[in-house]
Regions:
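A local structural motif
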Residues: 48, 61-66, 101-109, 231-242
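Short helix-initiation/N-cap motifs at beta->coil->alpha
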Residues: 55-57, 110-117, 240-249
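Proline-aspartate-enriched helix->loop->beta-strand connector
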Residues: 125-131, 147, 253, 257-261
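Extracytoplasmic substrate-binding proteins
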Residues: 145-211, 296, 308-327
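Structured C-terminal subdomain patch of bacterial secreted/periplasmic proteins
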Residues: 259-327
């Protein structure tokens, strides 16, 4: 009997040990996975459908991506051309050769730079009109037809004004990245010219030749980018700032004796050339200057400097001309 009882006790102990081991081996209950986030990603802000543009003649509300664009300012036309933005109407009468494609019949002729054809422009129902100094007097009348923005460059703050105008176009047409890239290239060239202009023998006089007469331009003038942005030292700092420049004599040029003489030929640009600027400038008096003696009379392309300017194409070309002219 005792033996039987001992055997039963051993069997019970063994069963208890097995149950205990199985309990120990059982995996612990897994920790619940964190619930998936239900927060939606932040929505990208919608692009504005209208911009309020501040300019020299006021403020103008313009819808973004305007389809029918009328352009009087050739500098702005070359910016639009560079960015691949189509226009509807252009003042075709004085187009510079590098913008000759806009003489095509697919572009409406909107009058001359001084006399807009208001009736024709109104019939086009434009979404945007871009003007500059030659159309100042027509601003109010054009504004009755469509949103009108003044995009002429302020000569006293040339690069800031040019940059602002370029960025306005970038925002209006969704071309910000392209505008920034072009501006970066231009600024790199400016740095290169600044380094050249730092030399002590680079004093310059800027002139315009028209009808056999010569006028001078200095800092703050329409051609003052040479001094104000490119840092070329003026041969005379106190030149009258006016649209048509300060009337000067050939004796004046000899007196100032510039190391560089920059010349813009107005008559070539407007098609009234009887004599070239070179024939007028390179006379016996001017031949006494350092500029002539050292081969540093630089004839600038009036299509950029006189007819247009202030655009992505023209400003780059203007700076490049000065860069090549400085030795």
């Amino acid at each position: 009997m005792l033996v039987c009882m001992l055997m039963l006790a051993l069997v019970a102990a063994a069963c208890g040990s097995t149950a205990s081991n199985e309990t120990a081996k059982a995996p612990a209950a897994s920790t619940p996975a964190p619930a998936a986030s239900t927060t939606a990603p932040a929505a990208t802000p919608a692009a504005p459908t209208e911009l309020t543009i501040k300019h020299q003649l006021g403020e103008t509300k313009v819808k973004t991506n305007p389809k029918k664009v009328v352009v009087f300012d050739y500098g702005m036309l070359d910016t639009l051309d560079k960015l691949g933005i189509e226009v509807t109407g252009v003042a075709q009468s004085s187009l510079p050769p590098y913008l000759a494609k806009y003489k095509d019949a697919k572009y409406k002729n909107i009058g001359t730079l001084q006399e807009p054809d208001f009736e024709k422009i109104s019939a086009m129902s434009p979404d945007l009109i871009l003007i500059s100094g030659r159309q100042n007097a027509s601003y109010a009348e054009l504004s009755k037809i469509a949103p009108t923005v003044f995009v002429g460059v302020d000569a006293k703050r040339y690069m800031d004004s040019f940059t602002e105008n370029s960025k306005i176009i970038g925002k209006l047409f969704g071309k910000e990245a392209a505008v920034d890239a072009e501006l970066a290239k231009i600024n790199e060239t400016i740095k290169k010219v600044n380094a050249k202009a730092a030399a002590p023998d680079k004093k310059a006089l800027i002139t315009l030749v028209s009808g056999g007469k010569v006028t001078a331009y200095g800092p703050g003038s329409r051609f003052g980018i040479i001094h104000d942005v490119l840092n070329v030292v003026p041969a005379e700092k106190n030149i009258e700032v006016s649209t048509h420049g300060q009337s000067i004599s050939f004796e004046y040029i000899v007196e100032k004796n510039p190391d560089y003489l920059f010349v813009v030929d107005r008559e070539t640009a407007v098609g009234e050339s009887k004599t070239t600027a070179k024939q007028v400038i390179e006379n016996e008096l001017v031949k006494k200057t350092n500029a002539y003696k050292n081969g540093n009379i630089v004839y600038l392309d009036a299509n950029y400097w006189y007819l247009s300017g202030g655009g992505l194409i023209s400003v780059a070309a203007m700076i490049d001309e000065v860069d090549k002219g400085l030795k």
